[in-house]
Regions:
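Start-transfer (signal-anchor) and selected internal transmembrane alpha helices
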Residues: 1-57, 269, 273-280, 365-382
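Membrane-interface coil-to-helix junctions
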Residues: 45-139, 168, 177, 182, ...
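Membrane-interface helix-loop junctions at the exits of transmembrane helices
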Residues: 49-54, 159-163, 167-176, 287-298, ...
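Periplasmic/ER-lumenal interhelical loops and adjacent helix-loop junctions
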Residues: 67, 284-360
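Membrane-embedded helix bundles of polyisoprenyl
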Residues: 134, 138-147, 155-199, 207-252, ...
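Perimembrane helix-loop-helix junctions
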Residues: 239-282, 356-367
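Signature aromatic-anchored transmembrane alpha helix within multi-pass, membrane-resident enzymes
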Residues: 246, 279, 384, 434, ...
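C-terminal luminal/periplasmic domains and tails of membrane-associated envelope-modifying transferases
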Residues: 493, 530, 534-778
Length: 778
């Protein structure tokens, strides 16, 4: 079959081109301009639709957000929305009575302050997270275009460059932490550094001098706006922007120095002006942090994990997950690196960078980009610092250690402030792509019209699976269902009848979806809850939570509060008659409640009980235990108890007649531990700092009772008075943390945990059963 001439591509293009040029010049210009700006509008909308379910922009769809980190962020907004303005940036509903600031729940102070004035006009269920995502994608494309347009051969290639800068997978991968999708702030900073004219000295005197100072300070004013807005969004982004701004300060300050006849000559007027112009942006950044709530009494400045959430040296070309690249093979990373350190460029942009490097080395035309690269030199020192902090003290390349060392004690606390250090290479990543685009623009200004679309096609093909995964993450927004774990209407009645909601254990992560759904109801009625997952925990609130859990173990709860179990937990005998169950959740209704509810039923318990911070074993602990760690829990002294509802344990062998108890435990120093079960001594354990398995027989009566009461007594090996607490500085947390922090400044002869044990897991099994496998490494 032969195509007619008018349908052949060459002829078709020639005909269209001839007809276009036959139009009046004004019409041609209007069509070109309209098409250009139309594409500028459509491109970010298509990018948004590629990575998000478009229903997220419906502000009344809240159910999709009540999960993982999103739940923390939207609850912070909902609680603050229902507080009076007198609390400013603070609310006392989440983690009552101490509460949280907008920053401690990562609730986007910028949008929170924007929407709160209209709270009486907003729907009862309202979220701005979806609108924020759309806003960020549009702003990202806008600043990408502003950044690249002065260096592109034409406005069409500038659009291609803006799409390339907006097609980085790491931008959309951070949707779980919505404020970190504001990576357009980095592009804004690079635009100010690269494209905006440097400030100059003011002229004249008096009012003319002042007006000239502001008129000649466009870059300073730009940084004032940028640092303030960034400070209202997220401190990590502010740290990155500060590196770009710091590079500009370095350029202007040291640019005033030059060598004349082997002597260093400095223009002190320029240097003084540079210092003075640095003050307003810095001051506004501090003000923004204050408004958002970064400076709060009791808030821990940092958290553990520096070195775990680092940037892997293969991050730019490792997709991490098989579905995240259709071309390159993924290499699994440590849990923290695979999230915070994820910065895969996409195969299309990898080709872009490689092509730019090859052209820069081999072609003279690319050397014209040297002037552009030379202007970036002041960023060298700040970006090296960012890179080293991001890589951390544990650098890896495809899972192999490049270096690994212990941080000096003096650096541990400062490093904890930036524990999610893998993010800090974002400015470097964006500058890498910008530089590659400029090199290609300068070396192949005509061919780029073909090369850049090819790069974008390859990029789209490579990350299509990643795009689908991101859309799936927001797919619940397509439903108007609000509650998934707590659908019964009785929950609304119970919350209305109560003066607050208390959760046990006070650990949101044990069942975050249950917590978020009930807490949304509570905060919507301005009812306080006893706990909250915060970006930086408040040590005073932690002490309150621990005291509240100890009170529950003694049978003391607030009778006018709704008491909710995040996992099924044993309760003191005096509270059992009040226990009820709704939607499979164990609760104690508030006093005076007439809601008809069924009594609780135990789901079978595993015969192997673990005591990590997310394990059900933490529900079985009595008093004298510290906050659980990821793999176990320390007793707070030489005596500690726990209770196992033995009647509801599902054993590997049906109806066993006898049982043995195998414990995995360790201690801080060699100790002898006596173990009692239901008041009867069943054996002893010799524990050391190395975790060991210890098997003890249980009395026949253990299977006849309702509860297995286990008691540990540590036999001290040496006199208490000579046991000295470790001198290594540690981050204080747990029961009485705020008080212990103050007491730590005084010499304390005994560390309670030094006399305790760490319980990792317990296995109950018949004697003839094979020995249990070790479940955790020591």
């Amino acid at each position: 079959m032969t195509l007619p001439n008018w349908l052949r591509p060459g002829q078709l293009f020639a005909n269209l081109n001839a007809r276009f040029h036959a139009l009046p010049p004004a019409v041609r210009k209007g069509l070109v301009t309209g098409t250009h700006w139309g594409l500028c509008v459509i491109a970010p909308l298509l990018l948004f639709a590629a990575f998000f379910d478009i229903n997220v922009v419906n502000p009344t769809r809240v159910g999709w957000l009540l999960d993982e980190d999103w739940g923390q962020h939207v609850l912070g907004w909902n609680a603050w929305r229902h507080m009076p303005w007198s609390t400013f940036n603070h609310e006392t509903l989440l983690g009552a009575p101490v509460g949280n600031t907008l920053f401690s729940t990562d609730s986007n102070p910028l949008f929170a302050f924007l929407f709160k004035p209209f709270r009486d006009f907003l729907p009862a269920n309202f979220q701005y997270n979806g609108l924020w995502f759309l806003f960020c994608v549009v702003m990202h494309f806008t600043f990408a275009y502003k950044l690249i347009r002065p260096h592109a051969p034409g406005k069409w290639t500038a659009i291609g460059g803006a799409i390339a800068l907006s097609a980085l997978p790491m931008l959309y991968y951070r949707m779980r932490h919505d404020t970190l999708v504001a990576q357009w702030l980095i592009l804004w900073g690079l635009h100010l550094f690269i494209n905006v004219r440097d400030d100059t000295l003011p002229e004249g005197s008096g009012l003319r001098f002042v007006l000239s100072w502001f008129g000649n300070g466009q870059k300073m004013l730009g940084y004032c706006a940028l640092l303030f807005v960034t400070g209202m969004i997220h401190p990590y982004l502010l740290f990155m922007i500060a590196a770009i701004w710091g590079g500009d300060c370095i350029k202007r300050f040291f640019g005033a120095m030059r060598i004349v006849e082997r002597r260093l000559v400095a223009d002190w007027k320029v240097m003084v002006d540079a210092v003075i112009r640095a003050m307003p942006p810095l001051a506004l950044a501090i003000v923004a942090l204050y408004i958002g709530g970064s400076f709060t009494k009791g808030m821990s400045p940092g958290a553990g994990g520096y070195g775990y959430y680092s940037f892997p040296m293969d991050g730019w070309f490792n997709p991490v997950k098989p579905e995240f690249s259709a071309i390159l093979k993924a290499w699994p990373l440590d849990g923290g690196q695979s999230f915070e350190g994820y910065q895969y460029l996409g195969f299309g942009l990898i080709l872009l960078v490689i092509a730019a490097i090859v052209l820069y080395i081999t072609t003279p035309e690319a050397k014209t980009a040297r002037s552009f690269i030379a202007r970036l030199r002041p960023l060298t020192a700040p970006f090296i610092i960012l890179f080293l902090i991001a890589v951390s003290n544990h650098a890896q390349f495809y899972g192999y250690d490049v270096w690994k060392f212990q941080l000096p004690d003096a650096l541990r606390q400062p490093a904890a402030v930036l524990r999610a250090s893998g993010r800090l290479t974002w400015p470097i990543t964006y500058l890498l792509i910008v530089t590659a685009l400029v090199v290609l623009f300068r070396s192949r200004p005509k061919a780029i019209a073909v090369l850049l679309p090819l790069v974008l096609v390859v990029q789209a093909y490579d990350i299509a699976g990643m795009s689908r995964a991101m859309r799936k993450a927001t797919s619940l927004a397509s439903s108007d269902q609000m509650y998934y774990q707590t659908p019964s209407p009785e929950w609304d009645q119970l919350v209305t009848l109560s003066k607050g909601v208390d959760f046990y254990p006070a650990n949101v992560h044990m069942n975050d979806k249950l917590f978020y759904e009930l807490t949304w109801r509570a905060t919507s009625q301005a009812k306080p809850v006893n706990t909250m997952y915060a970006a930086r925990e408040n040590l005073i609130q932690v002490a309150n939570q621990e005291a509240g859990m100890d009170a529950f173990k003694r049978g003391e709860i607030k009778s006018d509060h709704l008491f909710v179990f995040l996992k099924q937990c044993d309760a003191p005998s005096e509270l059992w008659p009040r226990l009820r169950m709704l939607d499979g959740v164990w609760i104690i209704p508030p006093k005076g409640s007439t809601v008809d509810l069924q009594k609780p039923e135990w789901s079978p318990l595993r015969s192997e009980v673990r005591f990590g911070w997310l394990d059900q074993g933490t529900c079985l602990l009595d008093e004298n235990w510290s906050r659980p760690e990821y793999d176990g829990v320390w007793s707070e002294g030489p005596k500690a108890n726990l209770r196992i509802p033995i009647r509801h344990v599902e054993f590997d062998a049906p109806s066993p007649k006898k049982l043995e108890m195998t414990l995995k435990a360790k201690s801080r120093q060699p100790v002898l531990v006596t173990v009692l079960v239901n008041g009867v001594k069943v054996g002893e354990m010799n524990l050391t700092p190395r975790a060991t398995l210890n098997t003890l027989p249980l009395p026949a009566s253990a299977l006849r009772g309702e509860t297995l009461r286990i008691r540990f007594l540590v036999e001290e090996q040496i006199d208490e008075d000579v046991i000295v607490a470790p001198v290594t500085p540690v981050k204080l947390s747990g029961r009485g943390a705020a008080e212990r922090e103050a007491a730590a400044k005084v010499t304390v002869p005994v560390d309670a945990r030094a006399l305790g044990i760490k319980l990792i897991n317990i296995k109950l099994a018949p004697p003839e059963a094979p020995a249990p496998k070790t479940v955790l490494k020591s």
